[in-house]
């Protein structure tokens, strides 16, 4: 059984271009495959390998000399795969690690209020809470939380247009949002706060952490959670979907 790690952190990496090759070499040395994005604003990736290989990579990212302690708050989610879910290893340089297209939005300055999975059901059941799914439309089709609004985004960058047209900080006082692993909510919640919204919450660890920690008997989630690798989707307990698909490139949620 292989170990899959979804990881990200918003943190200044002015030397991100110089980090690309040593990071690629580190992953290759451990036969790790998947995709990692580097940008001046941080790191975002999903990778797979043996448990020992993934543990070695995570240890280096968090405490090794390569990032010099800048990833000590790395957001991590682990799951399993019965076979290698990625075709190759890619370490890419990007303008953003998740593409919103608004340079003024900075999650290192302000983000919404994190809500642990154990407290999520109570929040979304609260009257007047607007529940937003900030994933792409093809992901929402496979599963969502009961009562969630689907903004019908073809790509994450369209969230700005949705917010401008459909959300009003004077009318929508409390907003709760979620995504696969949490990274898109970091950007989306930061964006809404900069537009005058006061109460913005997001699911800590995303859908994946919720499915890992919340028993199916207590869950408000319906369907499966799409993931960007050959497993296609995960269910409660992070069990692999039975749906078949060709091996994907393993692109993390950058758009």
Curated annotation (Swiss-Prot):
GO terms for molecular function: oxidoreductase activity, acting on paired donors, with incorporation or reduction of molecular oxygen. Pfam families: Rhodanese, UPF0176_N. The gene is trhO. Belongs to the TrhO family. Catalyzes oxygen-dependent 5-hydroxyuridine (ho5U) modification at position 34 in tRNAs. The active site is at 179 (cysteine persulfide intermediate). Gene3D superfamilies: 3.30.70.100, Rhodanese-like domain. HAMAP family: TrhO. It catalyses: uridine(34) in tRNA + AH2 + O2 = 5-hydroxyuridine(34) in tRNA + A + H2O. Its EC number is 1.14.-.-. Residues 125-219 form the Rhodanese domain. Signal peptide: none annotated. The keyword Oxidoreductase applies. InterPro entries: Rhodanese-like_dom, Rhodanese-like_dom_sf, TrhO, TRHO_N. SUPFAM superfamilies: Rhodanese/Cell cycle control phosphatase. Keywords: Oxidoreductase, tRNA processing. GO terms for biological process: tRNA modification. The keyword Oxidoreductase applies. This is tRNA uridine(34) hydroxylase. NCBIfam families: PRK00142.1-4.
